[in-house]
UniProtKB/Swiss-Prot annotation:
Any GO BP annotation: small GTPase-mediated signal transduction
Post-translational modification Phosphoserine, affected residues: 272, 343, 346, 384, 464, 685, 690, 765, 961, 1092-1093, 1163
Main location group: other
Gene designation: Arhgap31
Assigned keywords, A-Z: Cell junction, Cell projection, GTPase activation, Phosphoprotein
Name under which the protein is recorded: Rho GTPase-activating protein 31
Pfam family, one: RhoGAP
A GO term for molecular function: GTPase activator activity
Chain positions of site Arginine finger: 56
GO cellular component, one term: focal adhesion
Subunit-level organization: Interacts with ITSN1, which inhibits GAP activity. Interacts with PARVA. Interacts with GTP-loaded RHOU.
Length: 1425
């Protein structure tokens, strides 16, 4: 079976072999009703083959070949021989091989389209009738054989409790052998097409299996009676396939088929390459379906062979496949329900793992099971929605609650092979049920029956989720476990594989799921109507709910109780991010602007929902459009972005409109769910697709308003367009030009929202105002914005999204990049959530902050993509629950952000931003203007404190904080004068405060955020458009209401309006410093942004984030925010800086990130971060020399200073920390002292501690990284830059580490750090970034600057809260509890002993996400995973 060539040769050699002979000819010549091979194999298997994984597992190749020869030589092999009894799977493999080698498949080529169409018919009854009619068209021999085979398989499925092979799994393994498309075989090399085809084929076969009695009872006689007439049909269906009626040798038959004009044989031959290498689906006896689906395009066949061949033992298969399979098994183990992990795992271990980790989300795994070529359906906006539902339905079959996954839709829509494969649609049970009704697609017919049958009727024996999951696993192509390299390539897919977040959704937010489902795609029925039907009418409703909810949510958010609601949004966003993975990052950027617009519109004409779908569109667009034109992207955006955005919609719409507080709470689960299921996101996206169009319609009304504002903004922004482009480039290194449009849209949208939301920021200024609601509004807003833009605007938005995504996807598509992007996206997701939350408050109040947040989201998204990838992994591992919190991180500010130490992801954005900065101060100013809008982005970014963090995030995304702030400033002028002034004032004050308290304030913000005013950060973010300012203000708002004073958070309008120029002038000074530093860092940052380390950290943080569950797991900045609002912002800056470098090094970094993301389980990335951390710690310690960057800069980048090798790192971090305390006397000091110890560790006390220490260090690392690098470059351009890069990397890593501890800080870290001391911190920090396995692999890659950077980055990730010493990131981990500046050396030492500690940390770090979820389980939680 594996050796197809040999088999084919045997086939040709076997003179009178039934193999490779046309079925009709063979049966006519042999006088048999059904092929003897099938009959004998089926009888044998029914007697002896009721074993685990029958038909899924592959037999021994030699035995298969021997059997084939015996059957071919007219012998009647004795299957009861010991050799075959010992290798029962060889008989099943032979049976599949026979059908795979048929010149014309059992379900003929001619009827392929009819089958797929019949199955896509919506009503099940209609499907049944259609399928029955199509089956009756089969030639009589094919009909009889099909009936025999289907009855046999249905009988085998009845033993699914023993075999773990229910109808879905059997359909998955058999579909490629029975149903093939010439077109697909012609393009057999196309993994995407093959995967999609397998999904469709699986749906068809599953449907037939589930309805075998109805189809063949009534139809069989007719079919048989029609034998004569059918003979005629046969010639039609089987073009002269049966030339000679006599039985000819295989060689002869094949030669004839090739030589003759038999299209089937001929085409099959050509398409599948030589018959020796039959179509990929048929390449492997057992594994063809699953393996094909699971493995990536390039590695598909090999992976398939490995997967199938792994042996009859599913566990061994898991082992063989490596990280993925092992994970799958682990998941299956984790999911008690899916005891059949063996068979399932081998088929889709990765998805299983993530889902199983989720535990309750195992259903999600099932739901994500198949990728139907939703692309078709997606092409039509409405269709895409339907597709999504179906997809969700499909995926949901296995899990009722995992319906939220809209991510798969994205994958389906988009042909991205890896992403598609990885994307797994997850629908909740309701969605599942409603999917068939709501969405007529391939999935629908198969899904509905599959779901029903599989979950309930068909296999009542295995009603438990285990069977469902099992089925899911098998049917999920992305579930395939692949080597690290493959996973790197598939990292994007891998991220989608992180269905766990979606599963988390399904598990945690079942109730909310229904609401989110509609947006998700695989949402419950009520949800679906929400997504599709509700869009026109619901849009307003949702907008209204959004507007109203913001206030209720805000309080919740302040209290962390909002955390669940926010989490849902965040998780949804996460899903979206995952779905988009890389693409969503860019799209998110575009979405954010659109979201801003939506915000605006929401304010004017509540249309958050429309915005969401479009947001989805945008998100999905990026992957679709990797580097395509805007228009193309737009077209694709409709499909793919919608998928992605649908996920977002899930969070926003569901949260707000359907599930005000409860929904939001539920949202977290969906939110986290997406990470692993970016694939699940696809389903959500699908509905989004249709929703966006609907949105356009409803947006039409608001369109005029928004368009007017946007047009004005656009006009203003047009000049900024180039700058935006630069920023975009930095953000998404791939396509600056494409990004520019996105940025433009963003800013345009931002500006109008800014104007509208001017009043809002004030109102939102209260920390809790924005909290929960904003995520929804923001998420919805993007779509609304899109719709409001109208077709033109939408197109532009889409184009920009597409461009951005195109840019980002390029790196993401790169084997490595997809994961980093995903992670960044994940990071962005939390930030987006924040933005959304802020947007909601802004919806309540002004629309300006919302835009800012949206913009912020873009950079974060970039960071979030990699993070998202990582997140999925976490989600997969029982982090889904936490993930929602983290997704709703914005909601649970502290947790979410610290948790998601996706700073590496963010770092890339920051780096890109820095790069943009390098492009020009003017560009920076413009960027800053954009940044103001990006302030929304900020919110979106992981910085839970939306304002401050957003500011930084924006900075990061746009060249540099300087540039960002300046851009914001410049942009503000574009904004209405009032808005501008408000922004300027806010930014100025915030910037100052932020710079001054960047380390401390972040810390204080975090504590405030985390404890007293968890929501405050959001309001702050909402209030500001400026990144730094917002960030700073948020801390001020939260901790000392400084923001209100500075930027009149209550009256941001007046503040910003009053001092737009003042801010410009002030910020320029501050920003220039920052700008320089960031620019400087930009160069080093690229080295720094080593995704590998970051990713590893991110990957670990994913778990941590999930662990935080309350906190923001999305991005390390977000996590930092959790720990310290401002610190996270700093993280974002650093992260973004790295993110830009990431993008520059996207392939490399993304590769690493991909490894990390796909292989958080792979551990290699983690270890890399750990090793790098130690290495960087050593280097940084040696290099650490006190260099004092501008105070402002220092405030913003306290930690990076230590990180800097130039020595400014060590001294400056102290200075910065001190400065920060000075600036923020109360909180900053507290932050500096306490942040590192227990920023996240203790809710309020420890959090302040850690926030101060960790935040200060983080911020210092981040700021030092970004700003300080500039400084560093000045004194020691090359050494400094190198050191800076490394430091920045270390900072990033610290952030990641911090993110890791962030999760701990929130829960375990609180306890551990409070009492654990440096060791606990070390475990926490190094642990997350470093996995035991990962550590050894990548740990010792410090030789290259990139590696060093990675190490540095890993180090920050490791000690996210204690980013005090960038250079001592590891040391910071060790020291994590105290002294940001001094701790550098100590921390370095602690980190240096990575070997012993690594093991410790690796388990704890690996299981950190759980730690986030469970305080006590912080260290062990990850291990549990």
């Amino acid at each position: 079976m594996k050796n197809k060539g040999a088999k084919q040769k045997l086939k040709r050699k076997g003179a009178a072999s039934a193999f490779g002979c046309d079925l009709t000819e063979y049966l006519e010549s042999s006088g048999q009703d059904v092929p003897y091979v099938l009959k004998s194999c089926a009888e044998f298997i029914e007697t002896h083959g009721i074993v685990d994984g029958i038909y899924r597992l592959s037999g021994i190749t030699s035995n298969i070949q021997r059997l084939r020869q015996e059957f071919g030589s007219d012998q009647c092999p004795d299957l009861t021989r010991e050799v075959y009894l010992q290798d029962i799977h060889c008989v099943g493999s032979l049976c599949k091989l026979y059908f795979r080698e048929l010149p014309n498949p059992l379900l003929t080529y001619e009827l392929y389209e009819k089958f797929t169409e019949a199955v896509s018919h919506r009503p099940e009854e209609g499907q049944l009738a259609r399928i029955q009619n199509v089956i009756l068209e089969l030639p009589p021999p094919h009909y009889r054989t099909l009936e025999y085979l289907i009855r046999h398989l249905a009988h085998i499925a009845s033993f699914s409790s023993k075999t773990n092979m229910h109808a879905r799994n059997l359909a998955l393994v058999w579909a490629p052998n029975l149903l093939r498309s010439k077109k697909i075989e012609a393009t057999i090399c196309n993994g995407d097409a093959a995967f999609l085809a397998v999904r469709v084929q699986q749906v068809v076969i599953e449907f037939i299996l589930n309805h075998a009695d109805q189809i063949f009872n009534g139809g069989a006689p007719g079919a048989l009676q029609q034998d004569e007439s059918r003979t005629i049909t046969k010639s039609l269906t089987l073009p002269a396939l049966s030339l000679p009626m006599k039985l000819v040798s295989l060689e002869e038959a094949q030669a004839r088929s090739l030589a003759t004009n038999h299209p089937a044989r001929k085409e099959r031959r050509e398409n599948s390459l030589p018959e020796i290498v039959p179509p990929p689906f048929h390449t492997v006896l057992e594994l063809p379906d699953n393996k094909r689906k699971l493995s990536s395009k390039s590695k598909k066949w090999k992976s398939i062979f490995n997967l199938g061949r792994s042996g009859s033992d599913s566990k061994s298969k898991l082992s063989r496949n490596g990280s993925v399979f092992v994970r799958g098994q682990r998941l299956s183990v984790e999911k008690a329900t899916i005891r059949p992990a063996k068979s399932m795992d081998s088929l889709c271990s990765v998805p299983v793992e993530g889902k199983e980790n989720k535990g309750n989300f195992s259903r999600t795994v099932t739901t994500g099971g198949f990728f139907i070529p939703a692309t078709k359906m997606h092409a039509s906006s409405t269709g895409s929605s339907c597709d999504l539902s179906k997809e969700g339905e499909w995926g949901q079959e296995g899990m009722p609650a995992g319906a939220e996954g809209g991510c798969e839709v994205g994958g389906q829509i988009r042909p991205l092979p890896e992403q598609l494969k990885v994307f797994r649609p997850i629908g909740d049970p309701e969605s599942e049920q409603s999917a068939p009704k709501l969405l007529g697609m391939f999935y629908t017919s198969s899904d509905s029956p599959g779901k029903s049958v599989f979950t309930s009727s068909l296999f009542q024996m295995e009603p438990s989720p285990r069977h469902q999951r099992k089925a899911l696993n098998i049917s999920e192509p992305f579930a395939v476990s692949v080597p690290l390299r493959v996973s790197a390539v598939i990292s994007t897919n891998s991220t989608p594989c992180r269905t766990p977040p979606k599963e988390l959704q399904s598990l945690s937010s079942l109730e909310e799921f229904s609401f989110q489902g509609s947006e998700s795609g695989g949402w419950p029925e009520e949800e679906k109507p929400l997504g599709a039907e509700s869009f026109p009418g619901s849009v307003t409703k949702k907008a209204a709910t959004e507007d109203t909810k913001p206030e209720p949510e805000v309080p919740g958010r302040a209290e962390c109780s909002q955390s669940p609601p926010l989490d849902p949004g965040t998780q949804v966003e996460k899903k979206t991010l995952h779905v988009s993975l890389g693409s969503q990052v860019s799209k998110e950027a575009e979405k954010r602007p659109k979201a801003e617009k939506v915000m605006e519109e929401s304010q004017g004409a509540s249309q958050p929902k429309p915005s969401t779908p479009q947001e989805s569109l945008g998100a999905g667009t990026e992957p679709l459009i990797l580097h395509e034109m805007d228009e193309e992207d737009l077209a694709q955006a409709l499909i793919w972005p919608e998928i992605q955005q649908e996920l977002k919609i899930i969070e926003s719409e569901e949260e707000f409109s359907s599930l005000p507080p409860a929904a939001q709470k539920t949202s977290p689960i969906p939110e986290s769910s997406p990470a692993p299921f970016p694939f699940p996101e696809a389903p959500g996206s699908l509905p989004s697709s249709s929703a966006p169009r609907e949105v356009w319609t409803r947006d039409a009304a608001n369109q005029s308003i928004q368009e007017a504002a946007i047009l004005t903004d656009r006009e203003k922004l047009e000049p900024v367009c180039s700058l935006l482009e630069s920023e975009s480039q930095q953000e998404l290194s791939p396509d600056p030009a494409s990004l520019a449009p996105l940025e433009m849209l963003l800013f345009e949208k931002v500006s109008s929202p800014a104007r509208i939301e001017i009043g809002g920021p004030r109102n939102l200024s209260p920390p809790l105002t924005p909290a929960p609601p904003p995520p929804t509004p923001l998420e919805e807003e993007p779509e609304v914005l899109l719709s409001k833009e109208g077709p033109d605007r939408e197109d532009a938005a889409r184009d920009s999204r597409t461009d951005v995504y195109t840019e980002q996807p390029t790196p993401k598509e790169s084997p490595g990049i997809p994961t980093p992007c995903q992670r960044e996206e994940a990071i962005a997701s939390p930030n987006e959530k924040q933005n959304a939350r802020h947007a909601v408050p802004e919806n309540k109040g002004p629309g300006l902050p919302s835009p800012t947040k949206e913009v912020d989201i873009i950079p974060q998204e970039e960071g979030g993509a990699p993070h998202s990838a990582q997140e999925p992994s976490d989600c997969d591992e029982d982090d889904t629950v936490t993930d929602p919190a983290q997704h709703g991180l914005e909601m649970v500010e502290p947790w979410e952000e610290p948790q998601w130490v996706t700073s590496p992801l963010h770092s890339p954005t920051l780096k890109e931003v820095q790069e943009s900065q390098t492009q020009g101060s003017q560009g920076h100013r413009l960027e800053r203007r954009l940044c103001h809008r990006p302030s929304l982005r900020q919110s979106h970014s992981l910085d839970s404190k939306t304002t401050g963090n957003s500011h930084w995030t924006l900075e990061a995304p746009f060249s540099s904080s300087c540039a960002n702030l300046e851009t914001e400033r410049n942009y503000e002028p574009l904004q209405p004068p009032a808005a501008r002034t408000k922004i300027a004032g806010l930014e100025e004050k915030a910037l100052k405060a932020f710079r001054e308290f960047s380390g401390l304030k972040g810390l204080e913000v975090l504590p405030s955020q985390k404890g007293p005013s968890g929501i405050q950060p959001k309001p702050v973010e909402t209030n500001f458009m400026g990144l730094a300012e917002g960030k700073e203000q948020e801390p001020q708002l939260e901790l000392s209401n400084r923001q209100m004073k500075h930027s009149d958070v209550p009256g941001p309008d007046s503040s910003k309006e009053s001092s737009p120029r003042a801010q410009d002038s002030t910020l320029p000074g501050e920003h220039p410093l920052q700008l320089q530093l960031k620019n400087t860092e930009c160069g080093p940052s690229k080295g720094k942004h080593r995704p590998s380390s970051l990713n590893l950290d991110s990957a670990t943080p994913i778990a941590d984030l999930f662990r935080l569950e309350n906190g923001a797991p999305f991005s390390s900045p977000g996590i930092e925010l959790s720990e310290l609002g401002d610190t996270k912002v700093t993280w974002m800056s650093s992260s973004h800086c790295k993110a830009a470098p990431w993008n520059s090094q996207d392939t490399q970094d993304l590769d690493i990130v991909a490894h990390t993301l796909t292989g958080r389980r792979n551990s290699a990335p983690v270890s890399v971060s750990a090793v790098r951390t130690s290495f960087m710690v050593k280097m940084c310690q040696a290099k650490a020399v006190p260099v004092i960057p501008p105070k402002i800069q220092y405030t913003q980048i306290p930690q990076p200073l230590p990180s800097q090798s130039t020595g400014e790192g060590g001294a400056q971090p102290l200075e910065r920390s001190q400065e920060e305390p000075g600036s923020t006397p109360e909180i900053p000091q507290k932050s500096t002292k306490d942040d590192s110890p227990s920023s996240l560790g203790s809710p309020e006390e420890e959090q302040p501690k850690q926030e101060t220490g960790a935040s200060a260090s983080r911020r210092q690392a981040s700021i030092t990284s970004c700003m300080y690098e500039g400084s560093s470059c000045s004194p020691e351009p090359s050494a400094s830059t190198l050191a800076s890069t490394q430091d920045a990397v270390v900072q990033c890593r610290k952030r990641t580490s911090e993110t890791e501890p962030s999760g701990d800080n929130l829960l375990s870290s609180k306890l551990e750090r409070a009492s654990g001391g440096p060791k606990a911190f070390h475990r926490s920090r190094p642990g997350r970034p470093q996995s035991l396995i990962l550590f050894p692999i990548m740990d010792h890659l410090p030789s290259s600057p990139t590696v060093i950077d990675s190490k540095v980055l890993l180090s920050p990730i490791r000690s996210p809260t204690q980013t005090v010493s960038p250079g001592l990131l590891c040391g910071e981990l060790a020291e994590n509890t105290w002294i940001t500046p001094e701790g550098v050396t100590l921390r370095n030492k602690m980190t240096i002993p990575k070997n012993g500690q690594r093991l410790e940390t690796s388990t704890s770090c690996f299981y950190q996400p759980q730690r986030r979820s469970v305080i006590l389980d912080g260290r062990s939680g990850r291990q549990i995973e």
